[in-house]
């Protein structure tokens, strides 16, 4: 049976369609370069870090940095944002590659704090990065006074150099301590959580929006505990930039992905898109418009005096209101930005 599945996988590998070496506009080459830079940033940082160890003069500095890396709690306490890095021209090229567009449904009061919940996860949440880790789509202009922190796995902040670059973009750990530290650090401080997580990425396919949301109550508990309003976000096109190989439940691929997720806490979707010199083989995403709609804030109930945790009833009431708002966003824009959909948005878990 497994041999049949492997054969089917090999048969699914596409014939390569090569891109022309000439006649491509400079702006498109710059856009592709920006995407490649971001995708290659992790191995580049690790290679630089290891290469520096070949220079004995730098050993004392590198040893101190490596020790400091394990004790540095910045990723859990708001990070080290550098506005100039978020505003680099590189990110404009990154966003224009697809392109990514940000649509604002309502104002956010800079005196409040917000948990911005992003859907769908996609393969690697490209639009979440473009919108909330950079200023490529003008987030700060549309939401003055709101300071967003895109959250990711804590394990990413154990990687030398790469961790520091991510923090310069305002990115932080998705741990509970990190979330609460950011939300309590002052008015306007907000977090962006890709709510579906690794499980949802395994369902990311063009023309579909299968969400893992029914059992996700952690972000709602967090909002009520900290008095932060919830902001639903939906990106049309996030699932359309990669083709994912068939990984239906019980298949060889599915079992490997679940095993890997259990061991590491994250998973690796087996997907492909295009390459630098071809249009259909590689891990550079397809060019496809991504339109991110930021919904109106949803106020959450306040905890009664002496209470430290919300009740199950409170969380389920807020969840129902949240799903209703998210559905309203999808229904409002689906015939504009998801005309070629195979099916409508579905809550699969």
From Swiss-Prot:
Catalysis: reaction(s): an acyl-CoA + a 1,2-diacyl-sn-glycerol = a triacyl-sn-glycerol + CoA
Pathways per UniProt: Glycerolipid metabolism; triacylglycerol biosynthesis
Signal peptide: none
Compartments in which it is found: Endoplasmic reticulum membrane
Key words, A-Z: Acyltransferase, Endoplasmic reticulum, Glycerol metabolism, Lipid biosynthesis, Lipid metabolism, Membrane, Transferase, Transmembrane, Transmembrane helix
Cellular-component GO terms for this entry: endoplasmic reticulum membrane
InterPro entries listed in its UniProt record: DAGAT
Record function comment: Catalyzes the terminal and only committed step in triacylglycerol synthesis by using diacylglycerol and fatty acyl CoA as substrates. Required for storage lipid synthesis.
Bilayer topology term: Multi-pass membrane protein
GO terms under biological process: glycerol metabolic process; triglyceride biosynthetic process
Lineage: Eukaryota, Fungi, Fungi incertae sedis, Mucoromycota, Mucoromycotina
Keyword Transmembrane helix: yes
Protein name: Diacylglycerol O-acyltransferase 2B
Enzyme class: transferase
A UniProt-annotated Pfam family: DAGAT
């Amino acid at each position: 049976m497994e041999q049949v599945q492997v054969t089917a996988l090999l048969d699914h590998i596409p014939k390569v369609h090569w891109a022309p070496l000439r006649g491509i506009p400079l702006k498109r080459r710059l856009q592709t370069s920006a995407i490649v830079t971001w995708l290659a940033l992790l191995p580049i940082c690790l290679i630089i870090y290891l290469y520096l160890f070949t220079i004995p003069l730098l050993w004392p500095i590198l040893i101190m940095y490596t020790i400091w890396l394990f004790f540095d709690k910045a990723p859990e306490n708001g990070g080290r944002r550098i506005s100039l890095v978020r505003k680099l021209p590189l990110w404009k090229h990154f966003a224009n590659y697809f392109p990514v567009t940000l649509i604002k449904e309502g104002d956010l009061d800079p005196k409040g704090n917000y948990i911005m919940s992003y859907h769908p996860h996609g393969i690697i949440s490209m639009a979440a990065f473009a919108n909330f880790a950079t200023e490529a789509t003008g987030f700060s202009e549309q939401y003055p006074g709101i300071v967003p922190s895109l959250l990711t796995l804590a394990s990413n902040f154990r990687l030398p150099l790469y961790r520091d670059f991510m923090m310069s973009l305002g990115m932080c750990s998705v741990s509970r301590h990190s979330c609460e530290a950011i939300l309590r650090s002052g008015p306007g401080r907000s977090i962006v959580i890709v709510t579906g997580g690794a499980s949802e990425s395994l369902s990311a396919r063009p023309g579909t929006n299968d969400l893992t949301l029914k059992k996700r109550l952690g972000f709602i508990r967090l909002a009520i505990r900290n008095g932060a309003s919830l902001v639903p976000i939906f990106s049309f096109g996030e699932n359309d930039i990669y083709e994912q190989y068939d990984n239906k439940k019980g298949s060889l691929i599915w079992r490997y992905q679940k095993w890997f997720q259990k061991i590491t806490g994250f998973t690796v979707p087996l997907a492909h898109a295009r390459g630098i010199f071809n249009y259909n083989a590689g891990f550079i995403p397809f060019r496809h418009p991504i339109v991110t709609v930021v919904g109106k804030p949803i106020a959450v109930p306040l905890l009664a005096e002496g209470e430290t945790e919300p009740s199950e009833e409170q969380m389920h009431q807020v969840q129902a209101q949240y799903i209703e708002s998210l559905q309203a966003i999808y229904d409002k824009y689906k015939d504009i930005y998801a005309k070629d959909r195979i099916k409508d948005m579905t809550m699969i878990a």
